[in-house]
């Protein structure tokens, strides 16, 4: 099979898989990935590890935030979209503030709030309450 045919087949099978998925489930999954990336960056700062994993997850978190912010539907849901934009902007600022000042709690604030909103229960709650 030629490379172009393989790419087309892959893209078609990838798109076919998304047709039956609820858009809210996709939105939740993206936010779950954001929580995980924020958590990893926070842990790496705590361990004082500056490595590819930390950098990759920092970039991943920023990319997810940017993607979420640019795909909000202001025409359909103005207030909700505005509120979500502000919330993701808060997350973005805390991420950048945390990575530049090496303060993991700044990043953890975003992750904990996302975790609570979507009820992921990904982040362990031991000692987290003093973060918020």
Language model: regions and residue ranges:
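N-terminal intrinsically disordered, cationic/polar leader segments
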Residues: 1-40, 44-63, 70-72, 79-93, ...
């Amino acid at each position: 099979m030629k490379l172009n045919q393989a790419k087309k087949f892959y893209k078609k099978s990838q798109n076919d898989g998304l047709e039956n998925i609820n858009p809210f489930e996709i939105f939740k999954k993206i936010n779950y990935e954001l929580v995980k990336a924020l958590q990893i960056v926070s842990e790496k700062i705590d361990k004082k590890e500056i490595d590819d994993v930390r950098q990759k997850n920092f970039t991943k978190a920023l990319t997810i935030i940017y993607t979420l912010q640019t795909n909000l539907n202001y025409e359909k849901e103005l207030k909700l979209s505005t509120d979500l934009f502000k919330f993701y902007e808060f997350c973005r600022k805390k991420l950048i503030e945390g990575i530049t000042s090496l303060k993991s709690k700044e990043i953890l604030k975003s992750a904990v709030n996302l975790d609570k909103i979507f009820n992921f229960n990904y982040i362990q709650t031991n000692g987290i309450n003093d973060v918020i």
